[in-house]
C-alpha cells in the first residue's frame, strides 16, 4: 500500500503544476508576439556611421581647386622658417669649455630633448586646424529630425569645423510663463542628440550677448546698413572659449543682458548677428596662437573667426520667383538683396515665414565675416549639404545652369539649399569710354596669362562693342561684341572675352557673371531676366550668343553644360546658346517633330557663324 501524501503537499504540487502551465503559456505567447512584432533593430554600428561620413564627403565631389581651398583653411598651417636675421651673431668667439661628465640628471635632460615632438609628427597627430561656424537651429524638430541635424554637425566637427549653436523654437511663444524653462529644455535636447552622435556638447544657458547696438557702431555703419541689435565684449566670450578649448560644442539660448543686467529673451537672429561681430573682433584682437619654436602647435587652437553661417530650418532656402517658387541656388547679396525683397511673393510669408529675416541675418553676418565666408540656408532633410558646402563652398547645383536642365532632371527640389555670399556689384557699360582700360587690361592678362595687344583690342571694340559686364572693381568681366555676318541682316552676338581674376575663381563670381550675361543676351525677354544688374532689366528680345574656345581649354566642360550646342573646328570649339524666348514659342513644334526637326532660321547658320568667327583677329601679342 502506497502512503498518501498529506493535503498540504498535494496543494503545493497543484500550484506548481499551474505555475508551470502559466510560464509555458507566457513563453508561448512571448514567442508568438515576437513573431508578430519584431524586436527593435540594434543601434547603428560605428562602422556604418563612418561609411555614411565617407559617402557624404564623396557626394560633395570636390574639384582640385576645392580641395586646395579646404586644405588652405583647415590643413596644417605653414610656419615661417627661421633666418639668420632673427639672431644676433656673437662678435667674439670664445673657445668652448671642456665637455662635462655625463651624470644621471644630464642624461635625463638629453633624453627629454631627444624625444621632443617634431613638426612632422605634430602635423600627423593634429592634421586639422579647427575653425568655427555659427549655426542657427530653427525648431521645433522631432527627435528623428534633430538626430539628422546633429549627425551632420558632428561630421563637420570631424572635418575641422566646430559649430557654435544658437537654438530657436517656434513652439515656444514669446511671453510664455515658462518660456525660459522650455527654451532650456530645447537646448538640452540638442545637447543630448549631439552626445548621442558621439560628440561632446556643453549647454550655455546664461546670456552671452548684450542688448542694444555696440556704443559707437552707429557712427561707423555704412549707408543703408544697420548694426546688430546686440553686441559683445571680449570677456563675454569666455564660456564659448572654454567650451571650444575643452573640445565641446557650445549650445546657446537666445538670451541677452539688458541695461539692468537681466537675462531676457531676444530673437535668435539678433543673438547670432551680435556673436558674428563680436567673434570677429575678438579674433582680430587675439589672433590664432602662433606655433612654438619647435614647429609644433597647440592641439586646442581654434580660430574664433566664423567661416560659415548655417541656418537649419524646416523649409530650406529662399524661394525665387524666377524658379516658380523653388529656392534660389546662389545669392549675390550686394546685387540681389533689394530685388529679392521686392519680388518676394506674399504667399511665401506663410510657407517660408523666416526666409526674409534669415536673408537679412546672412547679409549682416557676412559683412563682418571674411570675404571667403558664406552662409547656407538648408532644410533638416539635407544634412549632407553642410559637408558639401564646407568642402566646396559652392551651391548644391550651379545657378548658371539652364533652367530646363535644372528642373528637367529633378536636380532642383523644394528643399534644395540656398548659398549666400557677400558678392560683388554687377554693372553693364555700353561704351568703350566708360571702361577703365588699365584695370581691364590687368584683369584680362592675369586671367589668360598672356600679354594683351591693347591698341588693336580696344580699337576693335570701338567699332564692334555691344556691352561689357563688370563684376566688382574689375574682378571679372564679360565682353560681348556685334560681329557683321555676310548674308545676314542681323549681326552675330559674340562673347569676345569672359574672364575672372584668379583670386576670385571658385568664390561664385563666375556664376554671378554668367547669370548677368544670360539676362542681358540670350535670356533677355523672360520675366526672370529682370535682374538689377544695370542692364536692360529683362526688357527686349533675346539673341543667340556665340563664342569660341580652344579645344584643349579645361573650361570647355563648363561651357558644354551651359551651351545649347557646339561645333568642333580644328583647334577651336564653337559654342552657342539659343535665345530662350524664341525657343519657348517653338517648344511645341520641336517636341512633336522629334530630334531631326530644323527651323527655317537654323538652316546654314552654323556655317555662317564658323566663317565669321574664324576671321576675328587675335587680341594677344
Curated annotation (Swiss-Prot):
N-acetylglutamate synthase involved in arginine biosynthesis. It catalyses: L-glutamate + acetyl-CoA = N-acetyl-L-glutamate + CoA + H(+). The gene is ARG2. Residues 213-233 are annotated as: Disordered. The lineage of its organism: Eukaryota, Fungi, Dikarya, Basidiomycota, Agaricomycotina. Residues 424-600 form the N-acetyltransferase domain. Its main location: mitochondrion. One of its GO terms (biological process) is L-arginine biosynthetic process. It is found in: Mitochondrion. One of its GO terms (molecular function) is L-glutamate N-acetyltransferase activity. GO terms for cellular component: mitochondrial matrix. Residues 1-77 form a transit peptide. It is an enzyme of class 2 (transferase). This is Amino-acid acetyltransferase, mitochondrial. Pathway: Amino-acid biosynthesis; L-arginine biosynthesis; N(2)-acetyl-L-ornithine from L-glutamate: step 1/4. Its EC number is 2.3.1.1. InterPro entries: AceGlu_kinase-like_sf, Vertebrate-like_GNAT_dom. Belongs to the acetyltransferase family. It holds the Pfam family NAT. Keywords: Acyltransferase, Amino-acid biosynthesis, Mitochondrion, Transferase, Transit peptide. It comes from the Eukaryota.
Amino acid at each position: 500500500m502506497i502512503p498518501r501524501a498529506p493535503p498540504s503537499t498535494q496543494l503545493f504540487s497543484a500550484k506548481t503544476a499551474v505555475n508551470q502551465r502559466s510560464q509555458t503559456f507566457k513563453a508561448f505567447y512571448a514567442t508568438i508576439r515576437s513573431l508578430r512584432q519584431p524586436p527593435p533593430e540594434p543601434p547603428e554600428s560605428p562602422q556604418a556611421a563612418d561609411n555614411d561620413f565617407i559617402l557624404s564627403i564623396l557626394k560633395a565631389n570636390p574639384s582640385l581647386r576645392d580641395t586646395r581651398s579646404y586644405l588652405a583653411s583647415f590643413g596644417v598651417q605653414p610656419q615661417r622658417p627661421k633666418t639668420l636675421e632673427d639672431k644676433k651673431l656673437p662678435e667674439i668667439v670664445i673657445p668652448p669649455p671642456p665637455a662635462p661628465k655625463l651624470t644621471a640628471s644630464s642624461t635625463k635632460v638629453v633624453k627629454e630633448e631627444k624625444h621632443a615632438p617634431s613638426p612632422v609628427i605634430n602635423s600627423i597627430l593634429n592634421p586639422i586646424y579647427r575653425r568655427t561656424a555659427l549655426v542657427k537651429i530653427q525648431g521645433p524638430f522631432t527627435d528623428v529630425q534633430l538626430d539628422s541635424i546633429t549627425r551632420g554637425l558632428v561630421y563637420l566637427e570631424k572635418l575641422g569645423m566646430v559649430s557654435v549653436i544658437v537654438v530657436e523654437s517656434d513652439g515656444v511663444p514669446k511671453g510664455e510663463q515658462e518660456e525660459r524653462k522650455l527654451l532650456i529644455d530645447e537646448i538640452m535636447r540638442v545637447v543630448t542628440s549631439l552626445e548621442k552622435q558621439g560628440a561632446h556638447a556643453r549647454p550655455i544657458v546664461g546670456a552671452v550677448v548684450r542688448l542694444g547696438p555696440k556704443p559707437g557702431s552707429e557712427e561707423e555703419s555704412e549707408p543703408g546698413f544697420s548694426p546688430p541689435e546686440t553686441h559683445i565684449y571680449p570677456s563675454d566670450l569666455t564660456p564659448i572659449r572654454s567650451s571650444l578649448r575643452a573640445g565641446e560644442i557650445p549650445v546657446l539660448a537666445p538670451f541677452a543682458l539688458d541695461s539692468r543686467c537681466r537675462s531676457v529673451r531676444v530673437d535668435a537672429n539678433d543673438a547670432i548677428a551680435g556673436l558674428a561681430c563680436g567673434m570677429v573682433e575678438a579674433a582680430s584682437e587675439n589672433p590664432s596662437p602662433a606655433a612654438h619654436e619647435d614647429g609644433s602647435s597647440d592641439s586646442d587652437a581654434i580660430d574664433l573667426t566664423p567661416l560659415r553661417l548655417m541656418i537649419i530650418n524646416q523649409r530650406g532656402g529662399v524661394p525665387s520667383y524666377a524658379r516658380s517658387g523653388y529656392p534660389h541656388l546662389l545669392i549675390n547679396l550686394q546685387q540681389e538683396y533689394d530685388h529679392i525683397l521686392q519680388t518676394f511673393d506674399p504667399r511665401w510669408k506663410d510657407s517660408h515665414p523666416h526666409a526674409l529675416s534669415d536673408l537679412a541675418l546672412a547679409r549682416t553676418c557676412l559683412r563682418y565675416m571674411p570675404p571667403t565666408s558664406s552662409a547656407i540656408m538648408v532644410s533638416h532633410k539635407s544634412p549632407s549639404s553642410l559637408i558639401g558646402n564646407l568642402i566646396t563652398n559652392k551651391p548644391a547645383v550651379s545657378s548658371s545652369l539652364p533652367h530646363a536642365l535644372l528642373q528637367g532632371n529633378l536636380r532642383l527640389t523644394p528643399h534644395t539649399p540656398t548659398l549666400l555670399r557677400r558678392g560683388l556689384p554687377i554693372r553693364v557699360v555700353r561704351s568703350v569710354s566708360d571702361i577703365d582700360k588699365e584695370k581691364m587690361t590687368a584683369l584680362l592678362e592675369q586671367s589668360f596669362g598672356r600679354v594683351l595687344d591693347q591698341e588693336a583690342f580696344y580699337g576693335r571694340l570701338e567699332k564692334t562693342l555691344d556691352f561689357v559686364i563688370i563684376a566688382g572693381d574689375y574682378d571679372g568681366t564679360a565682353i560681348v561684341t556685334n560681329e557683321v555676318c555676310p548674308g545676314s541682316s542681323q549681326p552675330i552676338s559674340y562673347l569676345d572675352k569672359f574672364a575672372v581674376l584668379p583670386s576670385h575663381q571658385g568664390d561664385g563670381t563666375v556664376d554671378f557673371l554668367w547669370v548677368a550675361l544670360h539676362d542681358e543676351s540670350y535670356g533677355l525677354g523672360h520675366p526672370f531676366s529682370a535682374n538689377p544688374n544695370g542692364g536692360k532689366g529683362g526688357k527686349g528680345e533675346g539673341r543667340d550668343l556665340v563664342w569660341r574656345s580652344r579645344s584643349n581649354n579645361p573650361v570647355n566642360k563648363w561651357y558644354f553644360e551651359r551651351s545649347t550646342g557646339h561645333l568642333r573646328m580644328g583647334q577651336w570649339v564653337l559654342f552657342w546658346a539659343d535665345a530662350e524666348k524664341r525657343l519657348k514659342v517653338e517648344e511645341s513644334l520641336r517636341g512633336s517633330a522629334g530630334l531631326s526637326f530644323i527651323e527655317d532660321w537654323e538652316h546654314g547658320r552654323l556655317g555662317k557663324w564658323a566663317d565669321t568667327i574664324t576671321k576675328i583677329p587675335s587680341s594677344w601679342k
